[in-house]
Amino acid sequence: MSFRSLLALSGLVCSGLANVISKRATLDSWLSNEATVARTAILNNIGADGAWVSGADSGIVVASPSTDNPDYFYTWTRDSGLVIKTLVDLFRNGDTDLLSTIEHYISSQAIIQGVSNPSGDLSSGGLGEPKFNVDETAYTGSWGRPQRDGPALRATAMIGFGQVLLDNGYTSAATEIVWPLVRNDLSYVAQYWNQTGYDLWEEVNGSSFFTIAVQHRALVEGSAFATAVGSSCSWCDSQAPQILCYLQSFWTGSYILANFDSRRSGKDTNTLLGSIHTFDPEAGCDDSTFQPCSPRALANHKEVVDSFRSIYTLNDGLSDSEAVAVGRYPEDSYYNGNPWFQSTLAAAEQLYDALYQWDKQGSLEITDVSLDFFKALYSGAATGTYSSSSSTYSSIVSAVKTFADGFVSIVETHAASNGSLSEQFDKSDGDELSARDLTWSYAALLTANNRRNSVVPPSWGETSASSWPGTCAATSASGTYSSVTVTSWPSIVATGGTTTTATTTGSGGVTSTSKTTTTASKTSTTTSSTSCTTPTAVAVTFDLTATTTYGENIYLVGSISQLGDWETSDGIALSADKYTSSNPLWYVTVTLPAGESFEYKFIRVESDDSVEWESDPNREYTVPQACGESTATVTDTWR
């Protein structure tokens, strides 16, 4: 008997389910369109071809087109790293049009790393300079410097792309171009992590949870990347455990302290951002790295979110089980203190991450630390471990999903009618405020949307790096700095038929390496003898030809957890942003385990909320598992 028949017999398609689907379908539809808006807006803010940033050099990520009240027409190392990491993940999942943007960014950072600035030069602290002019020159005005999260985040972004290159056999590009740049940033992190600097909001000069968390991640994955390119990072290996040891000191017993050396309460979305940007899909609910589903991170989520409930008029009358608009920290006075789009989206994203982790491990645990978080959403919550097969688990997961979606719905409500996202929205009337078209806001939308759809990045190695010494030590280590000039990208990665010369100049002299490549196309497979890695996950794009009418939406459901375990309310929404009358294409890209076999179907949610299943039989698919094969496409037609 088909799954569709079973549904009919069990009576699952009822008014209650229709109401759930109605709310989800409305948000799904907006997110499908908004994701396209966000991707376009990000590219509009990247030089040299970005429509909104005339004058910015190639590959430079501009924070916002706003040049007055406030003037954000600069490039920040932190923001750029976070944005490019988002694009790298999209590229890994099949958005190959982003290739040149990522390459141009990496090339620009080779220049930026070598620019002398008020924080120093390449090997004397200059990598901690927070922002630069869009023409790749130093900004010399007064500013909160240094900011030590930037090099770590830039390293993470470049490692992500470097790993894609390695997974597809392009070892020379990863080794000769990406690794020397990453090595510089890892050297900075290892040398300066134990020194104070300004936090991500550029206001507190002290020690910041977000900074320390992303520094730990960068050194862990940096060491693994070094090994993958045939090198090593001893300074990564010696400092990562000490950084993790220090990270534990931010836990107060009930929430994560955002900054030492601050007179504030310490409740700050700095900590939510730290959790989501160190999320590892292979990790458990580990308190030591404050994984999104960990008791500490969930308790902190409640404390931070609740700190905004009473201070914004927008949040009046909302219960503890309802999402609210979220700002940076409750004492904020910038623009009179308002909710931020990226902060509100971070609150949602942490919960989507947690849902993914619970689903993967097949259970959730409630401890004394996290009990208040769960009780606010499910009054019957009690300490214990609940299997995914239990009714309590299902009820809690449903409540958390609804809570998470509530934050995204707030963003939908206050986004401009054309989808534009500024930095902030007014705490009283919800109107957009501060810098327009903030690049980070758009990146936050894309990452939250991906996590909502169970599209996750690769592991960064948390499971092998979650222990620390018995006694913390104030240490540092010296690495290797070298200037890098990228004259062009190899044809196997870029446009074909080019010659690449990467020149690396270190403190001990000059080492030049040249590579001539004759591969004809960026889509061809390298024929070199370089070893090739078999990916553990594959980005599978489902292309469906289906003629629809206005108000209808298409979802993908299937027999595995990534496709909702046949639950229609957990189906994956397809996008129609490429739909035309001559080519009615719906599509979605989902990251699935390599070698996984499963059954699936598409469903159509009508404008009246009714659900229509495809005709039988169930479709079947096995995810490829082969050397260098990290993407795949399935082409179907509605039946």
From Swiss-Prot:
Gene Ontology CC entries for this record: fungal-type vacuole
Bias class Polar residues marks the residues at 628-639
User: What are the start and end residues of every segment in region (Disordered)?
Assistant: 497-529, 614-639
Question: Which top EC class is given?
Answer: hydrolase
What's in the keyword line of the UniProt record? Carbohydrate metabolism, Cleavage on pair of basic residues, Disulfide bond, Glycoprotein, Glycosidase, Hydrolase, Polysaccharide degradation, Signal
Please list where the region (Raw-starch-adsorbable GP-I sequence) is annotated: 494-531
Q: Name all CBM20 domain ranges.
A: 532-639
Positions glycosylated per UniProt:
194, 418, 464, 466-467, 475-476, 482-483, 485, 487, 491, 495, 498-501, 503, 505, 507, 511-514, 516-517, 519, 521, 523-531, 533-534
Keyword Disulfide bond: yes or no? Answer: yes
Q: Which residues form the signal peptide?
A: 1-18
Which CDD domains does the annotation name?
CBM20_glucoamylase
Q: Report the active site residues.
A: 199 (proton acceptor), 202 (proton donor)
Q: Which domain of life is it from?
A: Eukaryota
Proregion span(s): 19-24
What's a Pfam family this protein contains? CBM_20
| Annotated catalysed reactions | Hydrolysis of terminal (1->4)-linked alpha-D-glucose residues successively from non-reducing ends of the chains with release of beta-D-glucose
Give the intrachain disulfide bonds: 233-236, 245-472, 285-293
Similarity remark:
Belongs to the glycosyl hydrolase 15 family.
Q: Which PANTHER family match?
A: GLUCOAMYLASE (PTHR31616:SF12), TREHALASE (PTHR31616)
| Name the UniProt record assigns to this protein | Glucoamylase I
Species of origin: Aspergillus kawachii
Gene from which this protein is expressed: gaI
